[in-house]
């Protein structure tokens, strides 16, 4: 059985409570091998009130929570019977199993929240020569001059038109030679 992302419908305004309840239930019922992550999709927004800027988190999908599950009868039961959960999105009728999100859909949502699904192993070093594999500089080679672990980016000096040109790239856009 493989793990997939599913969308769970909740009472609006109860998303964080459902997340907390579900995480407690997973732990108390020993379901960590079936239910992996519970995510309330949020993004930061800047509101201006009385001339003051304030950064607030807004729900991207009010009334919905994403859950990464290996779908079995037990895992379905645990999620479905969590207080505040009204059901799975994509299940037609009682007892039917829900439809998972497509892999790209979950990844897009997580990326939008800064929780990229695919974390790359970072074993690049300064001054290392790498090949650019994606983007407008694909197939160029260059030397790593800076590594920003927080942003998952590197600055690579690429030789273009006889000069070293600094290019900022994501870890996923480069490969070791």
From Swiss-Prot:
Keyword Transcription regulation attributed: yes
Domain KOW intervals: 128-156
InterPro entries: KOW (IPR005824), NGN (IPR047050), NGN-like_dom (IPR006645), NGN_dom_sf (IPR036735), NusG-like (IPR043425), Rib_uL2_dom2 (IPR014722), Transcrpt_antiterm_NusG (IPR001062), Transcrpt_antiterm_NusG_bac_CS (IPR015869)
Coiled coil ranges: none
Keyword terms: Transcription, Transcription antitermination, Transcription regulation, Transcription termination
Leader sequence residues: none
PROSITE patterns: NUSG
A GO biological process held by the record: regulation of DNA-templated transcription elongation
Calcium keyword on record: no
SMART domains (alphabetical): KOW (SM00739), NGN (SM00738)
One GO term describing the cellular component: cytosol
Protein function: Participates in transcription elongation, termination and antitermination. Stimulates RNA polymerase pausing at U107 and U144 in the trp leader. NusG-stimulated pausing is sequence specific. Does not affect trp leader termination.
Cited NCBIfam families: nusG
PANTHER family reported for this sequence: RHO-INTERACTING TRANSCRIPTION TERMINATION FACTOR NUSG (PTHR30265), TRANSCRIPTION TERMINATION_ANTITERMINATION PROTEIN NUSG (PTHR30265:SF2)
Family: Belongs to the NusG family.
UniProt name for this protein: Transcription termination/antitermination protein NusG
Source species: Bacillus subtilis (strain 168)
Organism phylogeny: Bacteria, Bacillati, Bacillota, Bacilli, Bacillales
């Amino acid at each position: 059985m493989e793990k997939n992302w599913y969308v769970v419908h909740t009472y609006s305004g109860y998303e964080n409570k459902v997340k907390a309840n579900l995480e407690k239930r997973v732990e108390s019922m020993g379901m960590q091998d079936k239910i992996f992550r519970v995510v309330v999709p949020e993004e930061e927004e800047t509101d201006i009130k009385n001339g003051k800027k304030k950064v607030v988190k807004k729900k991207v999908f009010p009334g919905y929570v994403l859950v990464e599950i290996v779908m079995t009868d037990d895992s379905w039961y645990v999620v479905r019977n969590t207080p505040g959960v009204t059901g799975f999105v994509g299940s037609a009728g009682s007892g039917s199993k829900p439809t998972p999100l497509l892999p790209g859909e979950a990844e897009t949502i997580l990326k939008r929240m800064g929780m990229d699904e695919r974390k790359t192993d970072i074993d690049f070093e300064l001054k290392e020569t790498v090949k650019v594999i994606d983007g407008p500089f694909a197939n160029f080679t260059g030397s790593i001059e800076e590594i920003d672990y927080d942003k998952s980016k590197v600055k690579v000096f690429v030789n273009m038109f006889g000069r070293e040109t600094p290019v900022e790239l994501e870890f996923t856009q480069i490969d070791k030679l």
